[in-house]
């Protein structure tokens, strides 16, 4: 009888059983969550790929449309006048010691607080007037798709909780702009380049670009571009300056 009692397996304490059950439940819950996240990421990658493909098609159509319109105008013996640009890229090229408060205020509104800071600006009557006020202190023009793409991918930082955060992951964009349907870098580029309905929100999300000093230096910062200097509107030639500074 004593031998039987000695061989009897001791019962597992109830508290230990509960801990094991809780651990197993937590593990199952964690695995389920990881599986759901994996499935979500896969679906997001597919959406991003499809959007990138659609944007590429749209950009190609826009380019071909311009070529076609110019060709038709030439054929009819006319000059083709492209539509007024809607987007500018503005770079601050000079300091502001001793300048008027008005100039200082406009540079702050454009978020150009440091030399070689750059920002995108939606062109309208009000913004063009602002650019004219600070023209001696800035270089600006009309960026092409490559410039917008390269700036955002190479020097794109987001304003997240008032901090400058590198946009290394689409999840950062999705968390801040997902409610607008903007979930990836290609969405940001498209919204900026086409000056979409959410341009202001997306542009404010982007931290001002911190560019490098241009390779080869600046010629004459105080002289307008049309007179052989660096300041003012250089239209599509801004793309060459962006390449030198990016």
Curated annotation (Swiss-Prot):
Q: Which Pfam families match?
A: Ribosomal_L30, Ribosomal_L30_N
User: Which gene holds the coding sequence for this protein?
Assistant: RPL7
Name recorded for this polypeptide? Large ribosomal subunit protein uL30
Q: Self-association or partners: how does it assemble?
A: Component of the large ribosomal subunit.
Q: Start-end of the sequence repeats?
A: 7-17, 18-28, 29-40, 41-52
Q: Which parts of the sequence are annotated with region: 4 X 12 AA tandem repeats?
A: 7-52
> Could you tell me what this protein does?
Component of the large ribosomal subunit. The ribosome is a large ribonucleoprotein complex responsible for the synthesis of proteins in the cell. Binds to G-rich structures in 28S rRNA and in mRNAs. Plays a regulatory role in the translation apparatus; inhibits cell-free translation of mRNAs.
Main localisation: cytoplasm
Determine if Ribonucleoprotein is one of this entry's keywords.
yes
The alphabetized UniProt keywords are: Acetylation, Cytoplasm, Repeat, Ribonucleoprotein, Ribosomal protein, RNA-binding
Coiled coil spans: none
BP GO annotations: maturation of LSU-rRNA from tricistronic rRNA transcript (SSU-rRNA, 5.8S rRNA, LSU-rRNA)
The similarity comment for this entry is: Belongs to the universal ribosomal protein uL30 family.
Keyword tRNA processing in the entry? The reply is no
| Annotated localization | Cytoplasm
A single GO molecular function term of this UniProt record: RNA binding
Quote the CDD domains the UniProt record gives.
Ribosomal_L7_archeal_euk
Residues with N-acetylmethionine modification: 1
């Amino acid at each position: 009888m004593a031998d039987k009692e000695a061989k009897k397996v001791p019962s597992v304490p109830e508290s230990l059983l509960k801990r094991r059950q809780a651990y197993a439940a937590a593990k199952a819950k964690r695995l389920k969550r990881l599986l759901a996240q994996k499935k979500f990421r896969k679906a997001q990658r597919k959406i991003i790929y499809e959007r990138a493909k659609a944007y590429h098609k749209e950009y190609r159509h826009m380019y071909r449309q311009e070529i076609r319109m110019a060709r038709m105008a030439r054929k009819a013996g006319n000059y083709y006048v492209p539509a007024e640009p809607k987007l500018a890229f503005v770079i601050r090229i000079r300091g502001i010691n001793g300048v008027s408060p008005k100039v200082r205020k406009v540079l702050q509104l454009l978020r150009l607080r440091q030399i070689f800071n750059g920002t995108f600006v939606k062109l309208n009557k009000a913004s063009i007037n602002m650019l004219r006020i600070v023209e001696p202190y800035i270089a600006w023009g009309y960026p092409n798709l490559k410039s917008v793409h390269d700036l955002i991918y190479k020097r794109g930082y987001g304003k997240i909780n008032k901090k400058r955060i590198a946009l290394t992951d689409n999840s950062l964009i999705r968390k801040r702009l997902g409610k607008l349907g903007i979930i990836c870098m290609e969405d940001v580029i498209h919204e900026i380049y086409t000056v979409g309905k959410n341009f202001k929100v997306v542009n404010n999300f982007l931290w001002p670009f911190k560019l490098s000093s241009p390779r080869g230096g600046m010629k004459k910062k105080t002289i307008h571009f049309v007179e052989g200097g660096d300041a003012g509107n250089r239209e599509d030639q801004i793309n060459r300056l962006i390449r030198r500074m990016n």
